[in-house]
Amino acid sequence: MGECTGITFIDSTRIPVCENKRQSRNRVFKGYAQKGKSTMGWYYGFKLHLLCNERGELLNFALTRANVDDRSPKIFNDLTKDLFGKLYADKGYISQSLFASLFDRGVYIVTGIRTNMKNRLMDVHDKIMLRKRSIIETINDMLKNVAQIVHTRHRSISNFIVNLLAGIAAYAFYDTKHSINMEFEREEKQGVKQLTLF
């Protein structure tokens, strides 16, 4: 696992264990997996929560049932216990109580705003970093498609856990990880000053 640098990204991804129409017949994960909903629709399985820094190194992870909320205090406190600095998240992590508890520990959570929320001023650096959240989405994609942590051929719960841990360990040993170049440059084009992140 990597170490916290003060810039952290968080996200969760779905891990289905079988097709929806087969969930009542699934005996391997009975009592473990649950039905949950993501942006892709309903599924039966688990949810993998990931934290990474701007260098693409995984900081922490947690596996929960699919019906557990991303903002669950127990899960979120365990995931973020060693963090400092800023935590960039999507709109699914908007919660006043979550913001307050993290702020008391010295972590500032930065999220986008929903359409039904009042506009608020955001630092230019934070706005640019929110657009760089694709780094954690890329990690999710690599874990699913390259390390193949998602498939429906598991024959036991221990096989599932070993496959998941092996995929995460394999990602930690990848030579090239996606990262963000944190150099800022002020460029002036036609009299307009602009801040650029490489």
Language-model regions: role of each:
Residues 1-198:
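Short alpha-helical elements
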